[in-house]
């Protein structure tokens, strides 16, 4: 994997739009080269610029309650070919790693609590079927 330049946010610094932008850029740089996630994301996203902008707005809305994101995450992920439930732990692990590289422990934990809740909601929306055991590993 290529070296990813990361400017760390000072632990005493407040969470800002700029810091969220650095997180999004650093995280998706890792996703794009990840052996499991890269093929799925790279085939689904033709132009990374708009996607990164959308993700900055999304995380700004989640963490700063800015209201900048105006999309539907479930609908967006329903259109992604190759998305599988077993990719979520890898996504969460990379996200956690990136948050801990950039932020104080408290801010990283706040991001990760939100990310885990979002992942759980997405998994439920994308993969739950009333006629099957949930979670699927309960079969």
Residue ranges and their predicted role:
Residues 1-139:
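Core of compact, soluble alpha-helical bundle domains
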């Amino acid at each position: 994997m290529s070296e990813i330049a990361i400017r760390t946010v000072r632990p005493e610094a407040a969470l800002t739009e700029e810091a969220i932008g650095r997180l999004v850029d650093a995280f998706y740089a890792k996703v794009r080269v990840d052996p499991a996630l890269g093929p799925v994301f790279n085939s689904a996203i033709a132009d990374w610029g708009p996607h990164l902008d959308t993700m900055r707005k999304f995380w700004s809305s989640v963490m700063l309650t800015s209201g900048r994101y105006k999309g539907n995450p479930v609908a967006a992920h329903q259109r992604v070919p190759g998305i599988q439930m077993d990719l979520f732990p890898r996504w969460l692990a990379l996200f956690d790693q990136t948050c801990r590289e950039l932020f104080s422990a408290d801010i990283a934990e706040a991001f990760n609590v939100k990310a885990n809740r979002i992942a759980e909601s997405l998994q439920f929306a994308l993969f739950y079927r009333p006629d099957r055991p949930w979670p699927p590993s309960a079969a």
